[in-house]
Swiss-Prot record:
The gene coding this protein: Kbtbd8
Organism encoding this protein: Rattus norvegicus
GO biological process: neural crest cell development; neural crest formation; proteasome-mediated ubiquitin-dependent protein catabolic process; protein monoubiquitination; regulation of translation
Residues in the signal sequence: none
Location of the protein in the cell: Cytoplasm, Cytoskeleton, Spindle; Golgi apparatus
Gene Ontology molecular-function annotations: ubiquitin-like ligase-substrate adaptor activity
Organism lineage string: Eukaryota, Metazoa, Chordata, Craniata, Vertebrata
CDD domains: BTB_POZ_KBTBD8 (cd18274)
Origin: domain of life: Eukaryota
UniProt family annotation: Belongs to the KBTBD8 family.
Protein name stated in the entry: Kelch repeat and BTB domain-containing protein 8
Length: 575
């Protein structure tokens, strides 16, 4: 059987369609636009047309048929799909094409449109997509858009489209354990906002909505006492509808269980050789969890936790089977972590493969900055910078840095990006796509650590030009364009420390991996301790506030730390 036979026939049919050869039906759509095509092709792809041409009705013998409610662009896309199996989707055409595919009963096009809309969900369009999916009864599109709304609930409720939900649609969103709210009061406030949009029509629904959606035991008594009498009466009715169980214990919403944790990437489990693991430390409770490791065992990835608490990784390399290989092949992978399922979701690849790039969120977009590759004559640092627009779901090249950088740091403050490495200190303005130079740090060094804290950029530790490791601390006042030396981090070089800087619970912290060598009965023994130090900016000193449990994992020299709010019930508990 020739596998290319069907493709060849389809190609020839497309040629005849383009040239108007042997066409036997003219389809007229809105605004009088006509398309000459082949009945057999239309009937083969669409039960709607098959029924039209074989039913014996008037249309089956006509040489021209008129279809009302179909746009010309959508009809053209359907025909292109019929003759090529390909369809080009955009935000402007996807819903109209879905509607046309629904009329013509072509589920394969509907599914492609649904997949496109799912991949382009954002706080601005998610409600509209959910309403659209509910209207057409598309299960997957409805479920996925509803999941997104629950995940981004606080952002979504600010949108005007939230007010267009029907009563049943609103209940289907709010009556869920997976709602990402840290306080039940947010749910109540969203209902009141929805109600106030059309008070006369919606007041009758309040008791039912309160009964099904509000978990009053999770609300503060002081808040309940301040509820206006008008709504209090509806609450009393709701309690009557739901019965005594309404005042008993309630399951917490997903967002209420979130705990800020320190995530360690590029760690190896103690009992699995060099197999990577991603431990998550809940400092407050002392619990340790494990995050799903990056796909393909990626190492030295760029890491970012967005303001919306989304975790992204980009670039990196896959470990070589050879123990001696150091020229790793750079990857262009881009992944987003799904909190509820504890897995990584594939996103559009970087335009440029890169190891050790820095990811920064600025002005609503994500930037991948610098890094290194092993190409041509060996190891090369990168100047290139690219930007990810979640609305367009794609990366685009922006102005490159004036100097190539690896082992650098990048932070954001007030819609500007700051990049530091050695004697170079750069700033980038996304609105102008412009890079400029700033006053370099007083002790130039690479492989240091940077974070923004109280309108200053703190730069800590690093390696000087003579390859000497230092634990210098400097703070750059962004408004004054001035560096200030702080007290060095007190650290004993003999313990071979490796440091990572994080902003945890709104304070600067250093996560320190220390190696201790002891001699017992003429046998050298190596042990490692991982500790957390908190910075007191008033006293200008560091205090140990936590020590991790021993022997859970091994942090190598290239480990990285990030801070995010995680959901314990979605993670694997280690300790």
């Amino acid at each position: 059987m020739d596998p290319f036979h069907a493709c060849s026939i389809l190609k020839q049919l497309k040629t005849m369609y383009d040239e108007g050869q042997l066409t036997d039906i003219v389809v007229e759509v809105d605004h009088g636009k006509t398309f000459s095509c082949h009945r057999n092709v239309l009937a083969a792809i669409s039960p709607y047309f098959r029924s039209m041409f074989t039913s014996g009705l008037t249309e089956s013998t006509q040489k021209e048929v008129r279809i009302i409610g179909v746009e010309a662009e959508s009809m053209g896309l359907v025909l292109n799909y019929a003759y090529t199996s390909r369809v080009i989707l955009t935000e402007a055409n996807v819903q109209a094409l879905f509607t046309t595919a629904s009329i013509f009963q072509i589920p394969s096009i509907q599914d492609q449109c649904a997949k496109y809309m799912i991949s382009h969900l954002d706080p601005q369009n998610s409600i509209g997509v959910f309403i659209f999916a509910d209207h057409y009864g598309h299960q997957e599109l409805g479920d996925r858009s509803k999941e997104y709304i629950r995940k981004k609930f606080l952002c979504v409720t600010k949108e005007q489209e939230f007010l267009q939900l029907t009563k049943d649609q609103l209940i289907s969103i709010l009556d869920s354990d997976d709602l990402n709210v840290d306080r039940e009061e947010h749910v109540y406030e969203s209902i009141i906002r929805w109600f106030e949009h059309e008070q006369n029509e919606r007041e009758v629904h309040l008791p039912e909505i309160f009964a099904k959606c509000i978990r009053f035991p999770l609300m503060e008594d002081a808040f309940i006492e301040k509820i206006p009498p008008r709504f209090a009466q509806a609450i009393v009715k709701s309690c009557g509808e739901k019965g005594p169980s309404n005042t008993n214990g309630c399951t917490q919403r997903l967002g209420m269980t979130a705990s800020e944790m320190i995530i360690c990437f590029d760690a190896a489990h103690k009992h699995s050789g060099k197999k990577q693991t991603v431990p998550c430390l809940d400092i407050v409770t002392g619990r340790v969890f494990k995050l799903c490791k990056p796909p393909n065992d990626l190492r030295e990835v760029g890491i970012l936790v967005s303001p919306d608490n989304d975790i992204y990784i980009a670039g990196g390399y896959r470990p070589s089977s050879s123990e001696v290989s150091i020229d790793h092949k750079a990857e262009n992978d881009f992944w987003m972590y799904d909190h509820s399922t504890n897995r990584w979701l594939s996103k559009p690849s970087l335009l440029r493969a890169r190891i050790g790039c820095k990811l920064v969120y600025c002005c609503g977009k994500m930037y991948a900055i610098g890094g290194r590759v092993y190409e041509g004559d060996g190891r090369n640092s990168l100047k290139s910078v690219e930007c990810y627009d979640s609305r367009e779901n794609c990366w685009m090249t922006v102005c490159a840095m004036p100097v190539a950088m690896e082992f650098h740091n990048a932070v954001e403050h007030k819609e500007k990006i700051y990049v530091l490495q050695g004697e170079f200190f750069l700033f980038y303005e996304p609105q102008k796509d412009y890079w400029g130079f700033l006053t370099p740090m007083t002790v130039p060094r690479i492989q240091g650590l940077a974070a923004v804290y109280k309108d200053s950029i703190y730069y800590i530790a690093g390696t000087c030009g003579n390859h000497q490791r230092v634990f210098t601390v400097e703070a750059y006042d962004i408004e004054l364009n001035k560096w200030t030396r702080k007290k060095d981090f007190p650290c004993d070089q003999s313990i071979n420390p490796y440091l990572k800087l994080v902003l945890f619970q709104n304070k600067l912290h250093l996560f320190v991996r220390a190696t201790q060598v002891t001699v017992e009965e003429h046998i050298f023994r190596t042990s490692r301790k991982n500790s957390l130090y908190q910075y007191d900016d008033i006293a200008d000193q560091w205090m140990k506030v936590y020590e991790t449990p021993d022997r859970l994992w091994d942090l190598g020299r290239h480990f990285e730390c990030a801070v995010a709010k995680l959901y314990p019930q979605c993670l694997q508990k280690v300790l």
